[in-house]
Amino acid sequence: PDFVIDTTAPSLTQVTPITTPSNNTTPSYLSTTNEAGTLSTSISQGFSSPNPNTVTADSIQTVTFNTLPEGTYSGETITVTDDANNAGSLTLPDFVIDTTAPSLTQVTPITTPSNNTTPSYQFTTNEAGTLSTDISDGFSSPNPATVTTGSTQTITFNTLSDGTYSGKTITVTDDAGNNGSLTLPDFVIDTTAPTLSEVTPITTPSNVTTPSYVFNTTEAGTLTTSISQGF
């Protein structure tokens, strides 16, 4: 009967590498092979597809790995073994699985209450990333909206309206797409001055050298006077 001698291994070509870094613990890798065969991998967790573990020739093949733990994957391979038992391998580009969110720590809260409508907040983060906030007015700095590790980061908000800001957050998103948030202490922006109204004026003329003046105010606060002798 006819028989075939085949000593040529399948040739694999990368189509789409695994995104890196990524928080996707079941990543996919796309490749082509010039021969059909059985697929295997050096990654110990294996793959969920294709199932069964066979691939065809001359079309894009997708391998989706089983759940992978966090870490750097270096020098890992996929292999196609043809019917003659020749094995052709392809080394995957190094990739990182990262599911840990950045951790943010407060350094200096926003002063409250304050009439500063562009307040600043200081914090640190253990991971670099992109900064965002749920305060709708946003921030003017940093610009671009990136932060680094190892030093105090300052965020300065755009002009904020008067009011109480409660439960607001800042968020750092790392390169793998993990979000770490920090809730700001409640703060108040108040640019409205107290309104004073006279109740009883100082009697005049008078021989009283320590006169009294009676008034009302719409807000509590610290009292001063332009009279140099004070009160």
Describe each model-derived feature in a short phrase.
Residues A87-L92, N179-L184:
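Extracellular and select intracellular beta-sandwich modules with Ser/Thr-enriched
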Residues T38-A84, T130-D175, L182, T222-F231:
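Extracellular beta-sheet repeat scaffolds used for adhesion and glycan interaction
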Residues T25-Y29, T117-Y121, T209-Y213:
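Structural beta-strand segments of beta-rich domains
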Residues P1-P10, P93-P102, P185-P194:
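Flexible, low-complexity linkers/stalks enriched in Thr/Pro that connect modular domains
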Residues L30-N34, F123-N126, V214-T218:
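Acidic, Ser/Thr
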Residues D2, Q14-P17, T67, G75-T77, ...:
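Extracellular/lumenal ectodomain signal focusing on beta-strand-rich modules
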Residues P10-N24, P102-N116, T195-V208:
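Short, solvent-exposed loop/edge segments of extracellular or virion-exposed proteins
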